[in-house]
Design a protein with these regions (language model features):
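Acidic/His-rich, divalent-metal-binding segments that scaffold phosphate/diphosphate chemistry
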Residues: 1-91, 130
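Alpha-helical protein-protein interaction elements
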Residues: 15, 28, 165-172
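N-terminal intrinsically disordered, cationic/polar leader segments
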Residues: 148, 170-178
Length: 184
């Protein structure tokens, strides 16, 4: 509903066919979660659904900001992770790339509110939740915290889904999982 955020969404998802094509095909990771073609889109839609839930249940959350941040939170992975069949990490970090893209897009939109731009960029920068997990910022607003929680939940639940699917009928203890930092 917010006209400025709608314009950013249109710039990428309506007007930029190259971005849309890459976004649909890319993985969300090399091997940890959603490490398959289309994984980025699947992960993004799952995170966005969870963020929609948060926005409905916590009225103080700025819904349009949160949904926009959810749709763009991992956009930098298109540049950070090489295309298939390589699907390997490049030197660029997706958090910084995504934040920079949002800043550049906001700068192209006349009268884009500075506070709204800062909040959107903050959500992107803080979506890993902790500095030791790669976030240059920790969540300082409700939208950033909700995005972090949705991103973390989807990544971990998808990881467990993949682990248990590979285990097949062997549903006993499978051993230590590095990403979960626990025996599963």
């Amino acid at each position: 509903q917010n006209k400025y955020l709608r314009k950013i969404l249109e710039m990428y998802f309506v007007e930029n066919k190259e971005f849309v094509d890459a976004f649909k095909k890319h993985s969300a990771a090399k091997s940890v979660h959603h490490g398959f073609m289309g994984g980025l889109l699947e992960h993004t839609l799952s995170v966005t659904d969870m963020c929609q839930y948060f926005a409905e249940h916590y009225p103080m959350i700025h819904r349009d900001l949160l949904i926009t941040a959810a749709l763009f939170h991992d956009m930098g992975k298109i540049q950070e992770i090489s295309d298939f069949p390589m699907n390997d990490y490049t030197d660029d970090g997706h958090i910084y790339i995504g934040a920079r893209c949002m800043e550049n897009a906001a700068a192209q939109i006349p009268n884009f509110p500075p506070k709204l731009k800062n909040e959107l960029v903050h959500c992107i920068l803080a979506h890993h939740g902790k500095m030791e997990f790669g976030s240059p910022k920790v969540p300082a607003i409700m939208e950033a915290m909700a995005l972090h929680m949705a991103d973390n939940a989807d990544a971990k639940l998808q990881t467990l889904t993949e682990v248990f699917t590979q285990a097949g009928d062997n549903m006993g203890w499978l051993g230590y999982n590095r990403f979960m930092e626990s025996n599963v």
